Amino acid sequence: MTQSEKIINLTNHYGAHNYVPLPIVISEAEGVWVKDPEGNTYMDMLSAYSAVNQGHRHPRIIQALKDQADKVTLVSRAFHSDNLGQWHEKICKLAGKDKALPMNTGAEAVETALKAARRWAYDVKGIEPNKAEIIAFNGNFHGRTMAPVSLSSEAEYQRGYGPLLEGFRKVEFGDVNQLKAAINKNTAAILVEPIQGEAGINVPPEGYLKTIRELCDEHQILFIADEIQAGLGRSGKLFATDWDHVKPDVYILGKALGGGVFPISVVLADNEVLDVFTPGSHGSTFGGNPLASAVSIAAIDVIIDEDLPGRSLELGEYFKSELKKIEHPSIKEVRGRGLFIGIELHESARPYCEALKEQGLLCKETHDTVIRFAPPLVITKEELDMALEKIKSVFA
């Protein structure tokens, strides 16, 4: 029995079976490359669902981690830490917002944004108590905690978790008429992924986000953009909402904000929104801790200094155009923006992902029939060409 098989057996025996990973164990990683305990090398084309946009173990981010770990790692928000202020300033200026509220995971940040939206609805907009509604979209994925689960349109995500939370409406992604019909006097916010990741890399119709912006302005509604997966360069723009030249009222960021090294997420908005929080109304023991702040500062610097959005745009256009040249009866559509690309099939994508793994390329199916490609944004054209050869061989 190999070391990998032993590890997988231990995980299957002692771990809850809430994931069905590909049968591979990763023990080392650098850049776009990962290695298993037996020494086999693979190209990572998933980037931990876009958490590793800067590449595995980017030296600047790792150095920031080490330097901070030698000083202080956690003080809780009962006290100030010496780099949280710097982090606040950097992330607010990056997004063009007045204030930031740091959390740890994407789901936590979504919960935070929903709490802010509801309190804003009552304190600022004047909606009748306990009547606020939030509109989301079919196919959405905002996390695994109870509010995101209640928002979901996937029956399996909700099965056995009732009673679900109330106050949510769902409409078809990209359908303007349904969205307009769902708005009423109690609508507090519209929560949208600018590109739906888990649903299969669904890109909205051109101008759809602009329409959301206009409707929010017209009806005094908060436009909340969940950029956890599509943001920070993944789509070929710093923020995926930039494709429609709009700025949401609230950004939710995570994943790549920690450079694939340490979890950190954030809700960003102007004073009118985040000033609804008062001392004791929200918090997190680890949110904004010194280690996360140091890592995140370095992670942001890498995104900007190395122009990862620009790299994603240029290489993504090349990659997508080459994928579209592949002719195979199983391929229904190739879509995406930047290095955030899906190949939708007429059949299950899992066997193709398993075949690509045998070719030394790691990716994962999503929504059953879509192969998702989201490599680290530091990938080179030469490495992309290597990936293309492996993909073509699987579809030969």
From Swiss-Prot:
PROSITE patterns: AA_TRANSFER_CLASS_3. Keywords: Amino-acid biosynthesis, Aminotransferase, Cytoplasm, Proline biosynthesis, Pyridoxal phosphate, Transferase. The modification N6-(pyridoxal phosphate)lysine is found at residue 255. Coiled coil: none annotated. Signal peptide: none annotated. It is found in: Cytoplasm. InterPro entries: Aminotrans_3, Aminotrans_3_PPA_site, Class-III_PLP-dep_AT, Orn_aminotrans, Ornith_aminotrans_bact, PyrdxlP-dep_Trfase, PyrdxlP-dep_Trfase_major, PyrdxlP-dep_Trfase_small. Its EC number is 2.6.1.13. GO terms for molecular function: identical protein binding; ornithine aminotransferase activity; pyridoxal phosphate binding. Its cofactor is pyridoxal 5'-phosphate. GO terms for cellular component: cytoplasm. Disulfide bonds: none annotated. One of its GO terms (biological process) is L-proline biosynthetic process. Pathway: Amino-acid biosynthesis; L-proline biosynthesis; L-glutamate 5-semialdehyde from L-ornithine: step 1/1. It catalyses: a 2-oxocarboxylate + L-ornithine = L-glutamate 5-semialdehyde + an L-alpha-amino acid. Catalyzes the interconversion of ornithine to glutamate semialdehyde. Belongs to the class-III pyridoxal-phosphate-dependent aminotransferase family. OAT subfamily. NCBIfam families: Orn_aminotrans (TIGR01885), PRK01278.1 (NF002325), PRK04073.1 (NF003145). This is Ornithine aminotransferase. It comes from Staphylococcus epidermidis (strain ATCC 12228 / FDA PCI 1200). The lineage of its organism: Bacteria, Bacillati, Bacillota, Bacilli, Bacillales. The gene is rocD.
